Amino acid sequence: MVNLKIAFAICFKSLQAAYQVSCRNLRFPIEHGQRSCPSQEFFMSFTFEKCFTSDGVEIEGLYQIQPKVFGDARGYFLETYSEKDFFEAGLKMKFVQDNQSKSSKGVLRGLHFQTLHPQGKLVRSLQGKVYDVAVDLRKGSKTFGKYFGVVLDSEKQNQFYIPEGFAHGFLVLTEEATFAYKCTDFYHPEDEGGLMWNDPAIGIDWNSVAGDVEPLLSEKDKKHAAFDSNNNYFDINGKWTN
């Protein structure tokens, strides 16, 4: 009986070791920013989803990102960033500065960009909900002057990646929201640029998400210029051209 138990234990350990080796080696290729295997969530802590205009045209470089959240009776755990997973998805940016802001309902921050020091941003809501928007300002892009918006929700833990060459802004939908940014370049106040939050040429439909909320803007954000389709803004790689 003792020998049988020993044999069973050895067999179980061997099977367990073999399974662990197979799991380590079973790495699936990235296709269109996502793993091609339906079991991807076991191996990767994030899913990456491309973004499209309302008429179905892909806005290259924008990604909605959903971390895998592990929850139980104690609470939850998640990875908010992994260089390994992001690099495998083709997002090989380097972040150099983290920012955080807190705003009340109806606050609209934007639409912002930096000129000579453009910033890529990985953004998420730590508390509350915001409607987050990116406008493509890359001259030569097939979506130049187009926008994409997504609701970022602290309960969902979803994220949004915006590369260099975009204007960015958000509107707070809940009583309060705490917002976090990871940036690929440092803040340079001398390089601040912006667009009108309600520019008719861009046509961001804030009301579809926020209803009749009257946005609260800073004096600076009230004075941003209108979008000019003849302005080069950034090149296709997100570098300032003016």
Go through the PLM ranges and name each one.
Residues 28-29, 38:
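Intrinsically disordered, low-complexity segments enriched in serine/threonine/proline/glycine
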Residues 35, 39-43:
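Short, Lys/Arg-enriched N-terminal segments with co-localized hydrophobic residues
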Residues 42-158, 174-176, 183-242:
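Non-catalytic, conserved peripheral segments adjacent to functional cores
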